[in-house]
Amino acid sequence: MPPKNCTHLGGCDSDCLTRSEIQALFREAINTLKHTMNTENVCAHMLDIVSFERIKEYIRANLGHFTVITDKCSKRKVCLHHKRIARLLGIKKIYHQEYKRVVSKVYKKQTW
């Protein structure tokens, strides 16, 4: 089933979260852990699978509480984007490598 297009009319449940918004969400989740003095592995890199796992679990457990508010949409419930977030949390390459992989896959057959 193709993703729904975002109408930006409030409670958005379509695939309109950008990667940078998701990265900002990850940073805010880590900042929340720091604020509550849960500082174990908060400096871990996403590719450090063992150390970052605790942060991933925190993000997964709290997806229902996260909301992204921007000028595009008044409230985008993050839990509705759980598949995309799970995919991003599962990437085991740096983003530059992942970008090159996706671009080469998409543009393998040039049509122009």
UniProtKB/Swiss-Prot annotation:
Domain of life according to the entry: Viruses
Chain segments carrying region Dimer 2 domain: 72-101
SS bond list: none
Region (Dimer 1 domain): 42-61
Keyword Transcription regulation found: yes
Similarity annotation: Belongs to the baculoviridae LEF-11 family.
Name of the protein described by the UniProt record: Late expression factor 11
Species whose genome carries this gene: Autographa californica nuclear polyhedrosis virus (AcMNPV)
Gene symbol of the encoding locus: LEF-11
